[in-house]
């Protein structure tokens, strides 16, 4: 079971949030997700299997097990039944963000620095709104993108402010898979060590 999060431990805000009905659903379910010790990544209504309400979430260390998904689904379902934001029948799908994940928090860019991503901005930057390249560095206000395909006259590196992001997603590569497996292994090892420390403390 997940541990409840103290009220003073506010979750890191998302840089990219939903609009319309997706936003309303996010506002309804995010307090439940946070209370159980998870972070909301994205809410999206998809026209598949009739209608699917897709909710992506994860722990603060980036992990998300099948049991975690089941726990969140059981906690979210009754809240959605009461609030009833969707006036049609739908299938609820709770999942991890996946390896080629959406990037929605500043910490995502720090965690996955060095990997390729594609992103879209809400304003023109260097006469473009769509970019692809490596996360070369991260600053408090944005990140430096190193383009993997540089057109004539373009700068190979440019700074993209977090406030200008409309969408961002990692690109699946062998390096990303390797980094994701390593991060998952480290997170599980840290969780096991924490559990052992808790058990040792209880025995004393």
Swiss-Prot record:
UniProt keyword Cytoplasm, yes or no: yes
GO annotation, cellular component aspect: cytosol
Main location: cytoplasm
Gene3D superfamilies: RimP-like superfamily, N-terminal (3.30.300.70)
Signal peptide (UniProt feature, chain positions): none
Function in brief: Required for maturation of 30S ribosomal subunits.
Protein name: Ribosome maturation factor RimP
Organism (species): Allorhizobium ampelinum (strain ATCC BAA-846 / DSM 112012 / S4) (Agrobacterium vitis (strain S4))
């Amino acid at each position: 079971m997940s541990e409840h999060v103290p009220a003073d431990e506010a979750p890191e805000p998302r840089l990219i949030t939903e609009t319309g009905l997706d936003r309303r659903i996010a506002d309804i379910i995010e307090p439940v997700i946070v209370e159980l010790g998870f972070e909301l990544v994205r809410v999206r209504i998809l026209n598949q299997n009739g209608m699917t309400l897709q909710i992506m979430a994860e722990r603060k260390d980036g992990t998300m097990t099948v049991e975690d998904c089941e726990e969140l689904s059981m906690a979210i379902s009754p809240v959605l039944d009461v609030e009833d934001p969707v006036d049609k029948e739908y299938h609820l799908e709770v999942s991890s963000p996946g390896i080629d994940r959406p990037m929605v928090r500043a910490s995502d860019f720090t965690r996955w620095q060095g990997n390729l991503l594609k992103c879209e901005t809400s304003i023109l930057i260097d006469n473009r709104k769509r970019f692809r390249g490596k996360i070369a560095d991260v600053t408090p206000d944005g990140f430096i993108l190193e383009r993997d395909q540089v057109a004539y006259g373009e700068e190979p590196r440019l700074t993209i402010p977090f406030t200008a992001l409309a969408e961002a997603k990692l690109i699946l590569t062998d390096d990303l898979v390797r980094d994701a497996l390593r991060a998952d292994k480290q997170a599980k090892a840290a969780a096991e060590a924490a559990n052992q420390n808790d058990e040792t403390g209880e025995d004393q």
